[in-house]
């Protein structure tokens, strides 16, 4: 539902709590009694993908705005993110947030992988950095396994 409906349900006691995006509430003029949570946003949040026929006027125009270096960094980050999720048998519906960020402007630069795993009553957070994407995935997977984070994910199944 929309924000009005959610707030009404909260105030009527139908909900114990709700989680809303602060940016949206502020933009819509809601002044709420709230608490800001510090957590990772979903990977690729705000990413826009376009697909068009090669050689068309629109593809030529878009190519002028397209930063190939940034694309390589974001693509590698998403590949790292997806590989890590596969390694830990998680998917986009799992109670985990993962962010892979490239340091610098080149695709083979150093990357940082941060993840948060949410159980019902606790969570685990870790961050790993390495210049080799495959090694980074291995380090993050080892950290996940060493800290029994799978147990937290399994609480939701």
What residue ranges belong to the model's regions?
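Small-molecule-sensing regulatory modules
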Residues: 2-157
């Amino acid at each position: 539902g929309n924000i009005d409906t959610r707030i009404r349900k909260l105030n009527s006691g139908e909900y114990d709590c709700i989680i809303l995006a602060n940016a949206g509430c502020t933009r819509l003029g809601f002044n709420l009694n709230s608490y800001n949570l510090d957590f990772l946003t979903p990977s690729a949040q705000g990413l826009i993908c376009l697909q068009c026929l090669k050689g068309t006027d629109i593809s030529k125009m878009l190519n002028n705005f397209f930063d190939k270096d940034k694309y390589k960094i974001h693509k590698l980050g998403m590949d790292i993110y997806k590989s890590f999720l596969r390694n830990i048998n998680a998917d986009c519906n799992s109670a985990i947030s993962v962010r892979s960020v490239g340091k610098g402007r080149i695709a083979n630069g150093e990357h940082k992988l941060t993840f948060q795993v949410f159980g019902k009553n606790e969570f685990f957070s870790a961050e790993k950095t390495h210049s080799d994407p495959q090694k980074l995935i291995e380090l993050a997977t080892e950290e996940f396994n060493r800290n029994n984070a799978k147990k937290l994910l399994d609480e939701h199944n």
